[in-house]
Amino acid sequence: MSKPIEIEIRRAPVLGSSMAYRETGAQDAPVVLFLHGNPTSSHIWRNILPLVSPVAHCIAPDLIGFGQSGKPDIAYRFFDHVRYLDAFIEQRGVTSAYLVAQDWGTALAFHLAARRPDFVRGLAFMEFIRPMPTWQDFHHTEVAEEQDHAEAARAVFRKFRTPGEGEAMILEANAFVERVLPGGIVRKLGDEEMAPYRTPFPTPESRRPVLAFPRELPIAGEPADVYEALQSAHAALAASSYPKLLFTGEPGALVSPEFAERFAASLTRCALIRLGAGLHYLQEDHADAIGRSVAGWIAGIEAVRPQLAA
């Protein structure tokens, strides 16, 4: 992959801490917020931002506790991330935006869109979080050859959620960064590409934000508050009319192509793009396709927006 255009990391004061972010594109263009998941950072958008910036004002924050953002003494629950992201958006003066999200970034995007539907110009998303009634819905697959891999993923995440085991695996062994992340990418990342993913988490204590997220996954009704919030957010998503773009990989991880097809068909104004071979961190395998598709999608929406307003 070609060396990305370097985009300067900036920092904003947020709730007594700071959040780092990448920003590029024309200031007067429509804003696009890029929201990453666990255990990544805005680094995952590095090859996508330059492709979208010709048509948009791109802002990609590092979630609190991740990347180069601060690590305040908080629990790093989903609702902590909601508070910090809300404050970041207010601090940056963003009043409307396209949302581009993956993994936990999608949960934040869905929750934001449910609370502030007028804020959302459009939503592009992939490998998304949703309320999962049973453990079989986590890493669900309809392909027989994928069943063993899916069951192994469930077993690992059950351990992450188990007191003591999760701490040993994520805080001590750094398993999420060293195993889950590369295991969710088809190509092999070199040390130079992995370094920005490793640097934020040098010690067990620094990895607490990474441990918190798998324990927040809304599975079988737990945790109850997150499960309920995402049920409401998904109901709002199903009722929404803003444009949507769903990317899916083959075989995917949280989202199989078959599930993605049904999900897109159930929504209003949702296009589906099949990227080909991909697991969970689709941005690392398909940056070019994602970037060009998002840019074209935004340009198309903005071209007709003045006509709709007339």
UniProtKB/Swiss-Prot annotation:
**Its Gene Ontology molecular function terms?**
haloalkane dehalogenase activity; hydrolase activity; identical protein binding
Q: So what EC number does this one have?
A: 3.8.1.5
Task: Tell me which residues this entry annotates as catalytic.
Answer: D103 (nucleophile), E127 (proton donor), H280 (proton acceptor)
- InterPro entries found in the cross-reference section: AB_hydrolase_1, AB_hydrolase_fold, AB_hydrolase_sf, Epox_hydrolase-like, Haloalkane_dehalogenase_2
Catalytic activity of the protein: 1-haloalkane + H2O = a halide anion + a primary alcohol + H(+)
Q: What is the documented function of this protein?
A: Catalyzes hydrolytic cleavage of carbon-halogen bonds in halogenated aliphatic compounds, leading to the formation of the corresponding primary alcohols, halide ions and protons.
Q: Which family does it belong to?
A: Belongs to the haloalkane dehalogenase family. Type 2 subfamily.
Q: How does it assemble?
A: Monomer.
Q: Mind telling me what this protein is named?
A: Haloalkane dehalogenase
Which source organism?
Answer: Bradyrhizobium diazoefficiens (strain JCM 10833 / BCRC 13528 / IAM 13628 / NBRC 14792 / USDA 110)
What's the name of its gene?
A: dhaA
